[in-house]
């Protein structure tokens, strides 16, 4: 079975969609563990589905390197085929990215390369663009700079608020993430081809 470790920082709505998909015997992957950088609400989803969890708060470590080492060890302990950043709001340390190169994907609420970073929805509204969307991309050492795997566009309705737009994008992200993971697990999408 194709195995996943997911990393989160918040409520875990994308994680929940992935866990629900993996709960089906027809889905070709399983979430082996969920890690967080804080006591995130999304950990409850993992516990509900009987998935093991770990929390590693960077502030509780004497150095970033020590945190990075334990994060990498905690991920590798579960021997995942894929690491999914499902709302993980921290830049992965370069040592982690290098050790897991070609095996980490992220979901981002914009059409990258437009609006990278933590405030993509706010930035899209401030820029006055008519279209935004969601991107699944391979993680590299930059911030939202890795090769794009899949993008889905969303027209921005006039007068929409930031929370409303974020909610629309989240619905697209859930479906997009579940489908991309399915394609990777089934071998229909080869991540190594994106790193060439």
Q: For the regions a protein language model found, what residue spans apply to each?
A:
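Short, well-structured alpha-helical segments in soluble
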Residues: 69-78
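Donor/substrate-binding cores of folate-linked one-carbon enzymes
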Residues: 21, 86-195
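Conserved acidic residues
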Residues: 32, 81, 102
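N-terminal Rossmann-like dinucleotide-binding module
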Residues: 1-41
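N-terminal glycine-rich "phosphate-gripper" loop used for MgATP/nucleotide binding
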Residues: 36, 60, 64, 78-94
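Short, structured coil segments at secondary-structure junctions
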Residues: 49-50, 100
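Short beta->alpha connector loops at strand-helix junctions that form conserved
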Residues: 54-59, 107
